[in-house]
Amino acid sequence: MLASLLAAGMPLGAQNLGSEYRLKRVIPVEGRQGVAADSNFYYVSGSTALYKYDKQGRLAAKNERPFEGLPLAANHIGDIDVWDGEIYAGIETFDDGRGENIQVAVYDANTLKWKRSIDWEPSSGQVEVCGLAVDRDGDMVWMADWVDGRYVYGYNRKTGRYVRKVHLRPVPQWQQGIFMVGGRMLISADDGDA
């Protein structure tokens, strides 16, 4: 499915929450799951592929076999983030509204090849991964759950160790994406018909 990437007027080198955004242009891209950006490229995830575009919207690289080499079987990529030359992707085997083999797969941002995975902690209560964000200040990776949006789940980015879950109030239903900026978590949600 072809989606569009909206290029906003925010400098990507700085992770600051702005007060006003204006649409500058629309860039047609493959994929419709997640979008991340660094100072040179846009990264887009489809359910089963990763794409890399330059700032002019030209396809620079793609990985249509992103599940190769993963320690656990998977069939779905959700949200992504990019930090320090690595793409962090929420990945799972998704079947009938539940996720299994949830993991944060880490890819090289230059080649889009898999490097390692951060294992999911089943005792956390998380049953699916829809949103993913890297907290650059706290050195954490956060995952959200579309099925049960009461919590977000945090992992140490360097060690991969599960750290904690945070109870959200009020509870955002049907979360789709999350992003960390300036110590705040931004959460997007859909209407339940994703």
Model features per residue range: what roles?
Residues L23-V29, E64-L72, I118-V127, V166-P172:
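Surface loop/turn motifs at the tips and blade-to-blade linkers of beta-strand repeat domains
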Residues L59-F94:
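Blade-loop segments of beta-propeller domains
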Residues N101-N110, Y155-N156, A194:
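Beta-propeller blade signature
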Residues A37-S39, V82-D84, V134-G138, M180-G182:
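Residue-level detector of Asp-centered blade-edge/turn motifs that repeat once per structural unit
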